[in-house]
């Protein structure tokens, strides 16, 4: 039976029991000692593929650990699950849908059937539609109501319609097409709308309304505000079509808004929002970096898709990263995972991976609705590396929690300044090294004595300078951030998340927890505005409503 129909109790599997026993044997394992004892440790636990180099040698693992984790992947049927994902089977069981973000990266000529229909012609038809629009805007042929060419594009969307595209367009800023600036409007907070429109001219601005339903509250409210702003700036209803296009599956609602049917880019129910940057949701990416670079992004993701599907688990980046996450979350008690990019342009990757990982694997029931038998997705957090060193890295080094980390760093900078990049790279490596090595009491005391500090002060200060070490991390190195390598990097994390969902027996492609807040939000809004007079379901919410109503002005 398919894994999504009959999820297992992973804790009852022999491979899980073997890992439990191995974890006890690893209680006193020291990475420092392991490196000293084995000069080949680095080469044994590194991997290169798809333009990415992965060093996972600074982990609480031996070759036996890797073998046992791979054994777990095999025992849960990961290979069959990967094949089910790629074949378009309904792996999103709660909604009865496939999850075919990988299809968006497949080359023209491939065939893939969903409900008996080959979807690949439609995928490439939309890609051609994107190509046409991007060409017209970049060539200055798409003009606003005063016949001036478009200079600014605003993507109105939230969640997956925002985080992925923003990550990619900013990560690839060095590839940006000159003459067109891309902006993102996600938050319903009016301050964000105000600050953005202060920088724009309506006559040269194009808005992309990205919403599958064309009914997402935040997106629709911002689209309505943008429309009102456009009209107030001198635009007309008759010329609205020049300034608004949509990415949606609800054509009727988009047309009613004033968008022409030929300017609506379709979405499919077999692509989830957090996996959708490869689709027409990626239109702002293509406008930002050009169509050839957008296709390189897709190509890089496709190479990772092939690697994930075909590489043996022992040499498979997404599989290994997923298994390491299971190792720490389920056997070492880790509750969170840090993403630490040492690259200014990758500063938003943590936000995208938060949604990708936490919305996918933040589940407490298995595919069949029964409770999970173990912890599932971790909290994902982090930020730009050097900045973090002067903020929260202290917790990583001397805190009481075990927090695995991924360091991501390029070898070459697009903007070299003196020896800055050498220092950036050195900082990245030294942080992972410090997490692994730590500092012993003996080393701390010797360091203080070398500074001529009196012995009584040495004994007082030494405990504060001890750093436990033995803290795990992965280091991902790319030669330089490019569309192809970035595509591979993002796809790698997508597949890592899927690996973990299969092991835990959960559905990585629904998000019912998000819906409850939306439903309750309508009732709260109605009570805030006086449209609903009945009390809220609880005294706390009602008290906060009353507090707002008694003080709100404007």
From Swiss-Prot:
This is Glucose-6-phosphate isomerase. NCBIfam families: PRK00179.1. GO terms for molecular function: carbohydrate derivative binding; glucose-6-phosphate isomerase activity; monosaccharide binding. SUPFAM superfamilies: SIS domain. GO terms for biological process: gluconeogenesis; glucose 6-phosphate metabolic process; glycolytic process. Its EC number is 5.3.1.9. Belongs to the GPI family. The lineage of its organism: Bacteria, Pseudomonadati, Pseudomonadota, Gammaproteobacteria, Pseudomonadales. Catalyzes the reversible isomerization of glucose-6-phosphate to fructose-6-phosphate. Keywords: Cytoplasm, Gluconeogenesis, Glycolysis, Isomerase. It is found in: Cytoplasm. Pathway: Carbohydrate biosynthesis; gluconeogenesis; Carbohydrate degradation; glycolysis; D-glyceraldehyde 3-phosphate and glycerone phosphate from D-glucose: step 2/4. Its main location: cytoplasm. The active site is at residues 359, 390, 518. It catalyses: alpha-D-glucose 6-phosphate = beta-D-fructose 6-phosphate. Pfam families: PGI. HAMAP family: G6P_isomerase (MF_00473). GO terms for cellular component: cytosol.
